[in-house]
Amino acid sequence: MARFPEAEARIFRKLVCMRCGATNPWGAKKCRKCGYKGLRPKAREPRGGGR
């Protein structure tokens, strides 16, 4: 995680489309690329193991 709140806000205050994976601004209601309304906040913790 980031060391200070400004950086954390800059990195994680984004929404990710669950259909195409595009990043969208925080207040978006639908995806800028495909128009899908299913947006999730960007994950704060890594999911994969990387192997």
From Swiss-Prot:
Keywords: Metal-binding, Ribonucleoprotein, Ribosomal protein, Zinc. Bind 1 Zn(2+) per subunit. The keyword Zinc applies. GO terms for biological process: translation. One of its GO terms (cellular component) is ribonucleoprotein complex. GO terms for molecular function: metal ion binding; structural constituent of ribosome. Zn(2+) binds at residues 17, 20, 31, 34. Its cofactor is Zn(2+). Part of the 50S ribosomal subunit. NCBIfam families: PRK04136.1. Belongs to the eukaryotic ribosomal protein eL40 family. This is Large ribosomal subunit protein eL40. It comes from Thermococcus kodakarensis (strain ATCC BAA-918 / JCM 12380 / KOD1).
